[in-house]
Amino acid sequence: MAEAAAAPALLTSAASAGKAPLPAFPENPPVGVWTRHVTCRYFIHGVCKEGINCRYSHDLATSRSAMICRYFQRGCCAYGDRCRYEHNKPLQEDPTGDTCTAPSESLPEPSGNINSKAAELAASELASGGPRAQDWVNAVEFVPGQLYSGRAPEAYTQGTVKPDEGREEPADPELKKQLCPYAAMGECRYGENCVYLHGDPCDMCGLQVLHPVDTCQRSQHIKSCIEAHEKDMELSFAVQRSKDIVCGICMEVVYEKTNPSERRFGILSNCSHSYCLKCIRKWRSAKQFESKIIKSCPECRITSNFIIPSEYWVEEKEEKHKLIHKYKEAMSSKSCRYFDEGRGTCPFGGNCFYRHAYPDGRIEEPQPRQKSGMSSRYRIPSPSAGIDFGSLTSERAETRLRTRKTKL
């Protein structure tokens, strides 16, 4: 109460002294006097919590100039038609019209090492309506909840630059040497404004992946494209060669079988007759015939020791040799279930395509295949893991010595 009573006394004393009285601020200042002309940024983004009680304007018609998408004006808006801002081109400014009053003559000069030419340039820009239109497009946008970093006038920033650094520096040369990944995959939204290099289109793949200057990169890419094209052509020829092949047992076109898993060929190693994998495996698993009859071809009776599963039909010798080599390499990486890391015995011996390895990684030495009907006393024992052959030999020697002593 004492402070409130002292306020009128100060006003009367100031008036009596011949000075203009200070305005008395009300206890509750009116809300929305000047803020009603400022558009609420939270309302623009649809997250204003105040609603009708907000002191800022919720009328979008009064802020059309602030709703123009600045990325669209640069030509690189990623949202396109889904952008919440307007995609309108900026209006042409009247070069003769003045948009603001002339600046005061008592314009304070900026401190520091700023020459008079930079100051005159700044004053002329302020007199003609401020910085250019494109500078406002590149201005920093204020986002609620983030720190605002202002931008100094262009003339002030250029005034402190040395004469030899006044020209615009080019883009990073390392970036210019790199190809744009977006242009290489199809389309770059930045177009000519992209900082990366857009390559020349390749005649084989149609992508912009050829470096305009690097001849080594161009030749390497063209070589890889030709190799990929040759593989695609080989695949096309293989499909064309296999689509009309008929199985010699079921007499059905292999590629037209109802079950997709049965559309595979069983290639015999020493024969060129065509069979589907299911039929030839069923033929070779019969028990009522001899082994020689089972392993022979149903048509020409030529014996084949194994069958190669294949998705495509192979008839030429060179192609069949490649297929057999790939098949053996693939099987050699899998462990044999009969050998079972040395705990079992494989009936195929050294002719087995699967991997015979012990738990410690040692590979079994090739053993001759066990013939059926051979007596067990003539079988060659296969080494197994966990057996100490030194102790086994010493036990046999002791047994023989005891037998001799008993005879004596």
From Swiss-Prot:
Biological or metabolic pathway of the protein: Protein modification; protein ubiquitination
Name assigned to this protein: Probable E3 ubiquitin-protein ligase makorin-1
MF-aspect GO terms: ubiquitin protein ligase activity; zinc ion binding
Gene name of the encoded protein: mkrn1
Keyword Repeat assigned: yes
Domain of life, source organism: Eukaryota
EC number: 2.3.2.27
Stretches of the chain forming a coiled coil according to its record: none
SUPFAM superfamilies: CCCH zinc finger, RING/U-box
Record Pfam families: zf-C3HC4 (PF00097), zf-CCCH (PF00642), zf-CCCH_2 (PF14608), zf-CCCH_4 (PF18044)
PANTHER family per record: E3 UBIQUITIN-PROTEIN LIGASE MAKORIN-1, MAKORIN-RELATED
GO biological process: protein polyubiquitination; protein ubiquitination
Substrates-to-products reaction catalysed: S-ubiquitinyl-[E2 ubiquitin-conjugating enzyme]-L-cysteine + [acceptor protein]-L-lysine = [E2 ubiquitin-conjugating enzyme]-L-cysteine + N(6)-ubiquitinyl-[acceptor protein]-L-lysine
Keyword Repeat: yes
